[in-house]
Every structure is written in C-alpha cells, then in structure tokens.
From Swiss-Prot:
InterPro entries: Fe/S_biogenesis_protein_NfuA (IPR017726), FeS_biogenesis (IPR000361), FSCA_dom_sf (IPR034904), HesB-like_dom_sf (IPR035903), NIF_FeS_clus_asmbl_NifU_C (IPR001075). One of its GO terms (biological process) is protein maturation. SUPFAM superfamilies: Fe-S cluster assembly (FSCA) domain-like (SSF117916), HesB-like domain (SSF89360). The lineage of its organism: Bacteria, Pseudomonadati, Pseudomonadota, Gammaproteobacteria, Enterobacterales. [4Fe-4S] cluster binds at residues 149, 152. GO terms for molecular function: 4 iron, 4 sulfur cluster binding; iron ion binding. This is Fe/S biogenesis protein NfuA. Binds 1 [4Fe-4S] cluster per subunit. The cluster is presumably bound at the interface of two monomers. Involved in iron-sulfur cluster biogenesis. Binds a 4Fe-4S cluster, can transfer this cluster to apoproteins, and thereby intervenes in the maturation of Fe/S proteins. Could also act as a scaffold/chaperone for damaged Fe/S proteins. Pfam families: Fe-S_biosyn (PF01521), NifU (PF01106). Homodimer. Its cofactor is [4Fe-4S] cluster. The keyword Iron-sulfur applies.
C-alpha cells in the first residue's frame, strides 16, 4: 500500500515525540478519484482512530488510512529529502486521482488509467492534458488534447515521441494513436 522511507520515518518520529503519547500519523486523500484529489499527512491521536481504518505498521511508526482513501494510496511513497537547499517531505500517490485498474480490466480503462496517472501529470506542468475519446476497432487510441496543449507547436512531438511510444510499449494490442484536436490558432486556443 504505502511505502515510507527510513528518512521519513525518522522525521515523523521527531515530530511525534512532541505529541500526545500514542499519536501516530494519518495519510489521506481529499476528493479521491477526481482531478482535484489532494493527499495529506496529519497527526492521528489514539482517540481519532476509527474502527474502519487500515493500520500500516512500519519499523518506527504506524500510519492510519481511512477506508475511502485506501485504494487511492496504492503504491504511494513518502520520503524526506535533504539537499543543498534544505529538506522537504514528499508524498507521491500516483493513484490518488484515479484508482489503479487491474490488468484484466477492459483496454479502454487501462489506457485511461495510464493517461491519468502517468501522462497527464507530465502535461500538467505546461497547463495541458489529454483525454481518451475512444479506441477504434482497428486498435487506434483517439485522443483529444486540452489546456496548454491546445494550439501548442510541440503537440506532434508530444503525441508521437511521448504518448504514442509509451502507450504502444504498455499496450501491444494498440496499433497507434491519433489526435482529433483542432490545433489551429483560434477562439478555442488556450494561449
């Protein structure tokens, strides 16, 4: 479920030492399974533990996860990173916005999962996103770009060298990827 590095456990131990005895941490997702999902960590005193919580025991601490957040924290990583600029706690939860799908799920769901959990976070850095519109009978994934990708001069490169390569590698049953977005500059353009 969740992995907490030794460095992060040490960091939490220092913080927990200043709290009520028996206090541990709670890891949660607000708005799980939506584009607005946000992850967080808080203190979890003994009287805040719910019967439906899952407890994840680590070498130095325990983490409580509520029933609703649990599936969205699959493969989550919490680390405490120190470099020349200082230190920070990082929480990466690739499934927070969309629940991980099983390998036996329909192709459409598996492709959508990869787009939402791996490709869109990269495009979001430029204000963009991509949506799967359909998968044709002859194995083409039909995509539509939005946000900062709409009208971007790099969209062909992103499609062929990034998205298509990744999707074809993960899903050999796909034959290619096509873009149905109108990229000519106009009223619909993002910039």
């Amino acid at each position: 479920m969740i992995r907490i590095t030794d460095a992060a456990q040490e960091h939490f131990l220092k913080l927990l030492a200043k709290q009520e005895e028996g206090t541990q941490i709670r890891v949660f997702v607000i708005n799980p399974g939506t584009p607005n999902a946000e992850c967080g960590v808080s203190y979890c005193p003994p009287d805040a533990v719910e019967a439906s919580d899952t407890v994840v025991k680590f070498e130095k601490i325990s983490a409580y996860v509520d029933e609703l957040s649990s599936p969205y924290l699959e493969d989550a990583d919490i680390d405490f990173v120190t470099d020349q600029l200082g230190s920070q706690l990082t929480l990466k939860a690739p499934n927070a916005k969309m629940r991980k799908v099983d390998d036996s799920a329909p192709l459409m769901e598996r492709v959508e999962y990869v787009l939402q959990s791996q490709i869109n976070p990269q495009l979001a850095g430029h204000g963009g996103r991509v949506t799967l519109m359909e998968i044709t009978d002859d194995g083409l994934a039909i995509l539509q770009f939005g946000g900062g990708c709409n009208g971007c001069s790099m969209v062909d490169f992103t499609l062929k060298e990034g998205i298509e390569k990744e999707l074809l590698e993960k899903f050999p049953e796909l034959k290619g990827v096509r873009d149905l977005t109108e990229h000519q500059r106009g009223e619909h353009s993002y910039y």
